[in-house]
């Protein structure tokens, strides 16, 4: 997604820079069941696993705030880099467990709830809009910011093969595949 690309480009040499050429779909981050199966079961001190990388951790904490479970400092946005130490209100005294995003699906047996990003959810057959207890909305700021992209080296941005790939990726078949996976296409079908 775009924030990840920005972070990547900030850390690599000019020769390694990449640019976005095709916008594909949004994979919502969601709060999933761990040892508890509904949000109505939430209790004092429950553990919630969140990704520990700066971009996804802030996004996960915003998701928990939007779900009404915590409060972050006023003015917190997707560009902020909040961590659990920034939580200003935690009515259930939740224990926020920071883990590598790829490990969270497998850690659900050890926590009450888990915040999992879309690509890691699909690896364990979780569909956000079906299995998520609380899901980022398809029309949210997160959906605009975290749209998945195809990237290339700048010199390839206008290459014919990129145009051909976009034409193939923006078909009705791909659109339907994305929807059936529980994600939100961010393109209109090419005519």
Question: How does the language model describe each region?
Answer:
Residues 14-70:
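A conserved helix-loop-strand patch within extracytoplasmic ligand-binding domains
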Residues 28-39, 146-159:
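A bilobed periplasmic-binding-protein/Venus flytrap-type ligand-binding module shared by bacterial periplasmic
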Residues 62-63, 84-120:
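Short helices/loops that flank or line small-molecule/ion binding pockets
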């Amino acid at each position: 997604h775009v924030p990840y690309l920005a972070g990547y480009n900030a850390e690599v040499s000019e020769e390694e820079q990449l640019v976005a050429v095709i916008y594909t779909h949004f994979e919502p981050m969601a709060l999933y069941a761990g040892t508890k199966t509904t949000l109505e079961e939430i209790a004092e001190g429950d553990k919630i696993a969140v990704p520990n990388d700066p971009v996804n951790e802030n996004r996960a904490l915003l998701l928990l705030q939007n779900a009404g479970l915590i409060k972050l400092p006023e003015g917190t946005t997707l560009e902020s880099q909040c961590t659990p130490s920034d939580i200003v209100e935690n009515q259930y005294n939740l224990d926020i467990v920071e883990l590598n995003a790829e490990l969270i699906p497998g850690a659900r047996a050890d926590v009450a709830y888990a915040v999992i990003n879309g690509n890691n959810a699909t690896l364990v057959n979780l569909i956000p809009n079906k299995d998520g207890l609380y899901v980022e909305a398809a029309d949210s700021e997160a959906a605009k910011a975290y749209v998945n992209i195809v990237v290339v080296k700048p010199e390839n941005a206008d290459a014919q093969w990129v145009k051909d790939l976009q034409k193939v990726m923006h078909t009705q078949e791909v659109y339907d595949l994305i929807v059936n996976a529980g994600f939100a296409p961010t393109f209109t079908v090419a005519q």
